[in-house]
Amino acid sequence: MAIAETLKVAVAANFKPTLEDLAEKFEQETGHKLLISAASTGILFNQLVNGAPFDIFLSADRQRPGMLKEKGMILPGSQHTYAMGELVLWSPGESTTLVELRDNKARLAIANPAIAPYGLAAQQLLENLGIWSYVESRLVKGASIQQTWQFVVSGNVPVGLVAKAQMVDGDQYTVMPYEYYDPIQQDMVILKRTQHPDAAKQFVEFILSESAQSLIESHGYFSVVKKDKDGSLIEKALIDKAPIDRARIDRARIESTLIKD
């Protein structure tokens, strides 16, 4: 009988609620438990580089897992995309648009672009829509997308660019056009320092399984795996989520997309 292990998992703040649900299913299927620590991707990356004893890292981008790979800190072949995030504009109790926000004096909450991938995506969106210069002085930056959400839900900031996965039934929000920010492609890796490589590999296989991906989709993310002809799961080509082609940004479409009648 296999020994049940406890895996220490560093997870981007936006994915923590989803991971908590996944952890229950993973324990039911394998007996292994997860000890979850959540923060912004940038903070977790710095902790890992400085020797934090995690087995697995679930990032909100693919750049930092790639940097860990370049440093020789991950198990070979362990980097996989597990989800794609999506930005929404959210103002509790009333709907708004970015163009309306541009023209009024309301503060806007975003995650800190320097350490949080959702914040970088928000900055790209605002810059490519020509709105950044109007709202920059009114930005309130959270240390993570979770803190950004808390700014808005508490009423301290009236509107925010947050993750779709943070919305619940009944929330009114506007999905931002993904053409205007680079894909929020969330990757995971197994750290080379892990003392539980077999259990960690089981976790990666579980996250990429059809049942886990269905749960991830139900939490507001895009699934990034599909079944191959032989029934095995493979990562999708992200053709419809390609990086921004800034030369093709259509200002007329911006107005028609974001201004209400």
Model regions and ranges:
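Exported/periplasmic ABC-transporter solute-binding proteins
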Residues: 2-29, 35-38, 42, 46-52, ...
